[in-house]
Structure formats: C-alpha cells, structure tokens
Amino acid sequence: YKDEWDIDTYFNRLEEELWTIKTISDNINQPMSDYFITMSKMVDLMWDAGSLVGPSRGSAGAMLLNYLIDITQMDPIALDLPFVWRFMHPSRPDYPDIDVDSESDKRALVFNKVKEYFNGIGGDVVNVCTFGTEGTKSALKTAGRGLNIDEDVINYLTSMIPNERGFDWSLSDCYNGNGEDRAPIKAFKEEIDKHKGLWALANNIEGLVTRLGVHASGVICVNGDFIEHGSYMKTTKEQLVTAFDLHDQEECGVLKYDMLTVSALDRIHQCLNY
C-alpha cells in the first residue's frame, strides 16, 4: 500500500479511463456513463437498505473511476493496481461487467429498495430468469425411469461419464466421440446398447428445459415500463422474472446489472453489531 501519492498520477489515470469510456461509447453509439452512474446509485441503495457492501470484486477494482464514485472501496493507485484490459478496453467495444456484493439475508430488501427507487423516477427493475436443462447424467436417469431399467444399471452408466473442469461429457461425446478431442468410451457404448431405446431416448432428453429459476445476481433496469422491452412470467414461487434468459433479453436492447450476495458480509455485520 502506497502512503505517498501525487495528484498528477491520479489525473493521468482518470484521463486514461475516461478516454477509454468515451472511445467505447463512440464505437457502440451509446453513452457508457449511464452504466456507471446507475451502478453507483445501486450501491448507494444497498447501503440505504442497511446492508454492508463488498469492497470490490474482480477487475472492476482496478478502475479509479469506480472508486471515486463509490462503486468500489479500494484505491487502485494506492494499492498499485494497473488499469487492466480485462475490465474494459477499446478493442472490445462493449459494456463492462461490475459485480457488487451485499448481504445474503438482505437480498429481497435490497432488490425492493432498488425497484422502489427506479419505479419512483419512471423506471423499472425486474429479476432475470434462468432455465435449467437436463444434463448428461440426469437425462440418463430420466430415460432409465421411463424405460423401467434397473437403477443400478443407470448408476453404473453414469459412473463412466468423464468430467472435465466441472463439466460432464455429453452423451454424444461418450457414445460417438468428438473428432480428435475425445474418443468414444467403448465400455459405455457396449453397456448402453444392451438396453434398447435407452441411448436414443436419453440423447433426446439431454438439454431439454425442465425448470425455471431466478438468476443469482442479474437484474434488468430500464427507463419506462419493462413491458416495452420484454415480457414477464412467474416462477413456482410466484416471483416475477423476465420471460427470456439473460442472453436473449440483452438482444432486446436491455442491460443487466449484477447484484450478488455473500454470506460472509452477514457474519461481519453481526460481529460489528455484537
């Protein structure tokens, strides 16, 4: 941590960051300043809701502007953090992605506070939906139940499915391979072929949408009524969410803001109140 600093260092850094914002804004023909102003207001509302707010997350902490407008609580120059290309760069003309943390127990309170404020100035805020799909193993289990195949057989088949970096191979990769990257799993293929129709049924089930949820952090914030930009639907808990998932909804011209929750902030707050 640097104890000494000079004003020119801060001005030069800020000039570089503002130049980057203007350059990208010109390239996409949209004022990126709106994003930073809105994000700053959301952080203010988190504090107003009585929640602690995380000091920073990810590469957003390397931007001096974020610190100056209270999005983050870390001085990147004092901490000797360079303004990195990962956060935003003219070669990638798009909006940055700032993640802000609040207390997990205050998630609903924070969301309602944000929604109340933006509704009051003629805007709208809505949670983003997520679609859960049948994975490789769950597709096999669903198909096995439908064909009345012994559960031990299905468990044996699922045990042969490789997992790379947290992701299971697809059924197609297990059965057919994937060019030069993945060879078919001979034992898997021989075992699944013993049960007529299992491979075809499981392969058709894999990837189907089977459940609806709420995005862990994403909210859509718009001017005017959200219905002008998309449509609503309800989760099983009667919560209003977007009818499209994040990527499809962004294609409709809206922008997602990330408000995450961290249980550690709850515990810190409890200690401070003790």
Predicted feature locations:
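Alpha-helical scaffold/interaction cores of sigma-54-like transcription cofactors
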Residues: 1-274
